[in-house]
Amino acid sequence: MQNLYSKFNSLINKKKTLLGVGPMSLNVIDSSIELSDFYKAPIMLIASRRQIDSSIYGGGYVNNWSTSQYSKYVRKKTKSGNIYLARDHGGPWQNNLDIKNKISEKDAMLSAKKSFENDIDNDFNFIHIDTSIDIHKKINLHSNMNDEKSS
């Protein structure tokens, strides 16, 4: 962890951009790895749970990969070691299976926890926790917050 922190601190001090790429397809993943290796530049592959997820949650739409398959592929393919795996929008109800089955809040939290554990076990470097979805509650995004306070 200290090594990772030192690398990113160095990039920040050099005012270098850290590019994050959504792994939308095998071509995007391979191209990102190729560019990272060629230019010796760090690139984060930032996968949502819909793109890549644990096999117990049906994997993801990218190559039908589970978290483990995805991590193994990327780690084997990269030569420079400058590819960082990141989870984007990890959290409850962030995969299609949880939404389709309309699972309870408790089960959604357990699903997110197991997915995060799988990310950690498969060498993900960054995890974005997103708790913004609640399929059981309707939120009016167009309401004025001041109107709600006065009610």
PLM feature spans:
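Alpha/beta catalytic barrel-like cores
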Residues: M1-R87, Q94, N101-A108, S115, ...
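Helix-rich catalytic cores of soluble enzyme domains
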Residues: G91-S151
